[in-house]
């Protein structure tokens, strides 16, 4: 049951009383803490929630409906957002979510987000820099588009969720992070370990590039941004371990250890020319 006060709530807000909370599966940082209450989702707010909400409202106002509409921040420290109905695949990902059709639809959705975000000024807002583009930029990016952060209907991506890593950057970097997670960019061992079936990964990167609408220069930029994306996630993981974050250490131990980042880097370096040739 939920009552209380919503901070930053517009006149359309409705506080539901007597509606049971339904826990939603998924997530790493907030695992077990995300619930559905009727038409809304409640999840722990973060230091950047106000900025994220402003961004989500702006892209919705621009006509892009593929993100949840923020409702407000509860006085119990949870943010409330619109619930978007559909299927959210969790690892090990089901076959339908690993198809080229699913990948292309995720990529087109990201392109739609980027187009809608161009009118939003990130200045004056605060952002999570953990996965942010090291080169910086002026376009707010998602930075963590993986299948479990996407809502699907009938195998087609219809919405992006979980924007806690959103930050300004380059569109190519955001697309590279999507590719790292959705192609995926992993060696054979880790691809199988996390439940991805064997696939032609260079060909899948081309599927993403085609779906986004990249020209020749854009494909070169994507290849270069892949290096930044691979380096950034490794640096974030090592930083969490160095600071002794128990949740990060437990997650890392459960998902292959710090060695998986070395394996990914070696695999990407060994296959870089193959990816470049396929993208042409």
Annotate each PLM feature.
Residues 148-179, 184:
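Catalytic activation segment of kinase domains across protein kinase-like and atypical kinase folds
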Residues 21-142, 146, 153-156:
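ATP-binding pocket architecture of kinase catalytic cores
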Residues 14, 18-20:
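Juxta-kinase regulatory segment immediately upstream of eukaryotic protein kinase catalytic domains
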Residues 233-280:
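ATP/Mg2+ or Mg2+-diphosphate-binding catalytic cores
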Residues 175-213, 229-243:
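Active-site activation/catalytic loop segments of kinase-like enzymes and analogous catalytic loops
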């Amino acid at each position: 049951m939920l009552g209380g006060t919503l901070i930053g709530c517009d006149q359309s807000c409705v506080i539901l009383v007597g509606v049971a909370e339904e826990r939603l599966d998924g997530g790493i940082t907030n695992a077990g803490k995300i619930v559905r209450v009727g038409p809304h989702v409640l999840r722990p707010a973060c230091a950047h929630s106000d900025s994220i909400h402003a961004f989500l409202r702006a892209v919705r106002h621009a006509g892009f409906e593929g993100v949840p509409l923020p409702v407000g921040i509860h006085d119990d420290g949870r943010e409330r957002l619109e619930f978007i109905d559909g299927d959210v695949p969790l690892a090990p990902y089901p076959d339908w979510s690993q198809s080229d059709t699913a990948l292309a639809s995720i990529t087109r959705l990201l392109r739609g987000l980027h187009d809608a975000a161009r009118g939003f000024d990130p200045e004056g807002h605060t952002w999570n820099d953990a996965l942010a583009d090291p080169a910086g930029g002026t376009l707010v990016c998602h930075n963590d588009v993986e299948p479990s952060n996407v809502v699907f209907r009938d195998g087609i991506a219809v919405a992006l969720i979980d924007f806690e890593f959103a930050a300004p950057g380059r569109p190519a970097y955001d697309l590279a992070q999507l590719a790292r997670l959705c192609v995926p960019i992993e060696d054979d061992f880790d691809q199988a370990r996390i439940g991805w079936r064997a696939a032609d990964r260079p060909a899948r990167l081309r599927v993403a590039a085609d779906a986004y609408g990249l020209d020749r220069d854009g494909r070169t930029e994507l290849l270069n941004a892949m290096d930044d994306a691979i380096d950034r996630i490794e640096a974030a993981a090592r930083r969490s371990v160095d600071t002794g974050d128990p949740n990060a250490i437990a997650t890392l131990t459960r998902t292959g250890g710090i060695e998986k980042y070395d394996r990914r880097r070696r695999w990407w370096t060994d296959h870089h020319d193959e990816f470049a040739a396929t993208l042409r």
